[in-house]
C-alpha cells in the first residue's frame, strides 16, 4: 500500500520532498517485504556513504545532479537519468549539487 502520497491525483514527484539545509531528507511512499519506494532530497555536498542492499536499487534523478559510486566506479546523473545499483554490491551517493531522487528497491523472494 502507498502512504504519504495522495492517491488518484497527478503529482510532480520532485515537489513531494523538500530540500533541507545541510541534510538528506526522505519520504517513504511504499514499503513491504518485496519493494521499497522512497523519495529523497540531498542538499549540496551531502552524501550517503558506501553500503550494500539486499535488493536491486533503482535511482531516478528528479532534480539536480548526483555522483553515484557502484563498486568503485563513478557515475554522474542528472534530472531524468536512471541507474540500477545491483544487490550486494557497495554503492554510495554524493550531491554534486542539490538533488532529488526516487529510489525503488526490489527485494528477492525468500
Q: What are these language model-derived features?
A:
Residues 65-67, 74, 90, 100:
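Structural motif
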Residues 1-34, 69:
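A short, N-terminal "cap"/entry segment at the start of jelly-roll beta-barrel domains
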Residues 87-110:
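Ligand-binding loop in jelly-roll beta-barrel domains
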Residues 72-87:
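Short acidic-glycine-tyrosine-enriched beta hairpin
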Residues 22-23, 36-53:
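Conserved short histidine dyad/triad with adjacent acidic residue
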Residues 62-63, 78-79, 97:
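A cytosolic small-molecule/anion-sensing beta-strand core signal
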Residues 55-67, 71:
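Glycine- and acidic-residue-biased ligand/ion/polar-headgroup-sensing regions
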